[in-house]
Amino acid sequence: MMPRKIVYGENAAKEFEYPEKSLIITTTTPDIYEKWLSYMGIKNYEIYDKVTPDPAIETIEEIKKKYDGKEISTYIGLGGGSSMDVSKYLSKLTGIPKILIPTTFGTGAEMTTYAVVSFSHKKKLLQDEAFLADVAIVDPYFLPGTPFNIMRNSACDAMAQASEGYDSKLGNPFTRFFCKEAFDILEDAIINDKPELLPYGAMLSGIGFGNSSTTLGHALSYVFSNEGVPHGYALSSCTTVAHQFNKSPYYERFKKVCQKLKFEPLKLKLALDEAADVIMPDKGHLDNNPIEIKKQDVIYCLDKIVNANPLS
């Protein structure tokens, strides 16, 4: 599955004709989004700019309540995965269509039927066909000026998605084609310092894993994200260890990219046994892993992540 309409390329966000009375949902500050909106030429809109990373269900309910009774034609998720995930969930609740526009190029959220929402301070991966964008717009305009930490976390996320998606039990020739293309492009972007390739690679990654799944690396990462570690940062070690465990063809290549991006080792406050108990119910990731995963395997992987510096 893919969005009903995909608009890609230089000036894509500038040339698109946006409906009036849209609600723009973003995580960024006025000094940044006002520049974006001027470029995009959007008129007669509302804006909600208080979305935080790993958005809570309470935030979504607050937005819905705030704009109940107002005439909203479209949700525009403008930013990283969190802004787009909030727009997806709101669209499912209200039936209002959504336009998704990434500015960080990592999650591939604009291409998928997935959304990550926090319930009781714990991230949960949700899937629903209603989360698919009505329009996805990918424009490299938003790339310049992206802080290094955001860029590297986003790139790692996209590469983890592509490589885990390639290995997934749900994969097929169609999804593996997109996952392979995405990884090759993203690897070239990082290793050979070609950041202009990141938007295209992330978009292809979203198509690939969005029609298969991510696997063990993502399942391991959420206990770190629950302790405040950015998602892409958590994946640097988690997906490296998962690829090694799975004997993935992407193990060495993924590790090399993470070394180039200079990710630091991860720490975990939660005891490994308790962390494994949190991870094991994540059947959406673990059941699609190429190798069957048991609790002792999760503990083994977590131990390597926090005690063996897998990126050294």
Residue ranges: model-predicted function:
Residues M1-T74, P265:
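ATP/NTP phosphate-donor binding region
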Residues I57-Y141:
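Glycine/threonine-rich beta-strand-loop-alpha-helix active-site module
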Residues K88-P97, F209-S212, N226-G228, Q244:
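Alpha-helix C-terminal capping segments
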Residues M159-S163, L198-G206, L220, T239, ...:
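Short alpha-helical scaffolding segments that buttress acidic/His motifs in well-ordered protein cores
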Residues T215, A219-D273:
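Active-site pocket-lining segment
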